[in-house]
């Protein structure tokens, strides 16, 4: 769904590539571990150290790649379409390969990976089916696809993905609302079966870092899904 009917903040909005190009410098200072790493750490159906060959779609600055290496992932590639984000990922040295490409059309060989991962990027897609189809194409038989996303609850409450420029001006990055059922439909049509799901809510750790979020206490802010190839 188009986000604009729900937009309460009316920040200037940037296209995705332009937005992340500008945000690259401060991205890791803004995105909290409670948004994504907390949920990844709670996943029970993936043995990261035994995951085989892994692809981090929309890898950004390499935050997730660094976490994956710390969990024992041995073979890891990172892919992103924003050069400025990818340069920071490459500088971390956590990926065997860094690939500049669109995650919906990677150009990578089919059945190349045992596990495909996409974290905090799906809200920028106008439609989900291409993501799930490309992940299915890249995954080997019985492969796994892990998705961690910004919860639609927050988008429906008018809060887009956004950051502050150097001068303090807040700007948003183009976002779309995908219900959790939209993920289920797109995944099933692409041949995936849900193995696990979790949701992260705003709790004390969040509020300690963002006191103004007290008003959102116990609201769902992110989600994780683990899919398996049928």
Each predicted region: which residue ranges?
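Conserved class I S-adenosyl-L-methionine
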Residues: 1-49, 63-67, 88, 144-170, 174, 207, ...
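Class I SAM-dependent methyltransferase SAM/SAH-binding core
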Residues: 55-57, 61-105
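A short acidic, Gly/Pro-enriched loop at the edge of an enzyme's catalytic core
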Residues: 104-116
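A short SAM/SAH-binding and catalytic strip from SAM-dependent methyltransferases
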Residues: 115-128
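A short glycine-rich, Lys/Arg-flanked "PGG" loop and its adjoining helix->strand segment in the class I
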Residues: 129-141
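Short alpha-helix
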Residues: 175-198
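Core SAM-dependent methyltransferase catalytic element
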Residues: 210-230
């Amino acid at each position: 769904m188009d986000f604009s009917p729900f937009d309460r903040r009316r920040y200037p909005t940037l296209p995705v590539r332009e937005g992340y190009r500008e945000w690259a410098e401060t991205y890791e200072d803004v995105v909290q571990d409670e948004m994504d790493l907390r949920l990844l750490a709670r996943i029970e159906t993936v043995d990261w150290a035994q995951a085989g060959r892994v692809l981090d779609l929309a890898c950004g600055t390499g935050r997730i790649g660094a976490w994956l290496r710390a969990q024992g992932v041995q073979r890891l590639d990172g892919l992103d379409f924003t050069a400025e984000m990818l340069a920071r990922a490459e500088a971390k040295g956590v990926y065997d390969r860094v690939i500049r490409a669109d995650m919906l059309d990677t150009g990578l060989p089919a059945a190349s990976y045992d596990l495909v991962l996409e974290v905090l990027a799906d809200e920028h897609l106008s439609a989900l089916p291409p993501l799930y189809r490309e992940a299915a194409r890249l995954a080997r038989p019985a492969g796994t696809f892990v998705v961690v996303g910004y919860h639609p609850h927050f988008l429906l409450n008018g809060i887009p993905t956004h950051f502050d420029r150097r001068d303090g001006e807040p700007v948003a990055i183009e976002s779309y609302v995908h219900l959790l059922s939209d993920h289920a439909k797109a995944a099933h049509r692409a041949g995936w079966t849900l193995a696990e799901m979790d949701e992260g809510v705003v709790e004390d750790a969040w509020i300690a870092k963002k006191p103004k979020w007290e008003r959102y206490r116990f609201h769902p802010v992110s989600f994780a899904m683990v899919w398996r190839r049928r």
